[in-house]
Amino acid sequence: MVRKLNKTYAPSTRNGTIKGQVKSARGKNLIYGKHRCGKGRNARGIITARHRGGGHKRLYRKIDFRRNKKNIYGRIITIEYDPNRNAHICLIHYRNGEKGYILHPRGTIIGDTIVSGTEVSIKIGNALPLTEMPLGTAIHNLEITRGKGGQLARAAGAVAKLIAKEGKSATLKLPSGEVRLISKNCSATVGQVGNVGVNQKSLGRAGAQRWLGKRPVVRGVVMNPVDHPHGGGEGRAPIGRKKPTTPWGYPALGRKTRKGNKYSDKFILRHRRKQQRI
């Protein structure tokens, strides 16, 4: 996606970037109102997820993660911005008159055709089961359970790789580096998710972060002892503990949080912490 630098009219725009995108009229039957309640709070109003709150109002775009319109060709009409995710989305017009949103595959442009099914070509944007894909195919929007819809590799720039097929399972390397088994009957979309350079975007000012619903991040060492275990002391003081902790006193920075007896451990061949090139 093309990115442009702002002119230096003001400090807030001096370091910001603008991303080129296609704007279009939104389909009324694909967009819903979204009530954002909580802002990082639980049912008692206590903060459980820090640094969240505020932000501009959003409308939810209904995304088709299932891709269950089999053998019905569709054409990409627009490439749009979605405030609910960092990837762009495409508005698809199908031959049967229906419309739908999908994640924008990298490399596709307005006017391209896509289709989903069991006997479709290996083309960017097409969705088909893993049994019909050759080894080494780059995929995204990957299902974990057949028919449930894509749940893996959906972020901007995400891509998984099909590296083996044996028996009823297929071996895939996920964007995190994890290698795991998934049923060959699960479906995925060919290609990589678009908007690859989103992590290199410069917002230019703090207010742009607040528009996204992100609040300031304050170090615990500069707080008071009542606010954080690292706080207090005279001047610039160390944390005063052997190991760093969370604001609630739990171990942080290196403590494993995954359950040791999780049922899906048997499907993981190589954990993401032990990344090796394949």
From Swiss-Prot:
Main location: plastid
GO biological process: mitochondrial translation
Keyword Signal: no
GO cellular component: mitochondrial large ribosomal subunit; plastid
Chain positions covered by the region annotation Disordered: 224-256
Subcellular compartments: Plastid
GO molecular function ontology, one term from the record: transferase activity
Xref: Pfam families: Ribosomal_L2 (PF00181), Ribosomal_L2_C (PF03947)
InterPro entries for the chain: NA-bd_OB-fold, Rib_uL2_dom2, Ribosomal_uL2, Ribosomal_uL2_bac/org-type, Ribosomal_uL2_C, Ribosomal_uL2_CS, Ribosomal_uL2_dom3, Ribosomal_uL2_RNA-bd_dom
UniProt keywords, alphabetically: Plastid, Ribonucleoprotein, Ribosomal protein
Subunit description: Part of the 50S ribosomal subunit.
Sequence similarity: Belongs to the universal ribosomal protein uL2 family.
NCBIfam families documented for this protein: rplB_bact (TIGR01171)
PANTHER family (alphabetical): LARGE RIBOSOMAL SUBUNIT PROTEIN UL2M, RIBOSOMAL PROTEIN L2
Name of this protein: Large ribosomal subunit protein uL2c
Naturally occurring in which organism (per UniProt): Cuscuta exaltata (Tall dodder)
Gene transcribed to yield this protein: rpl2
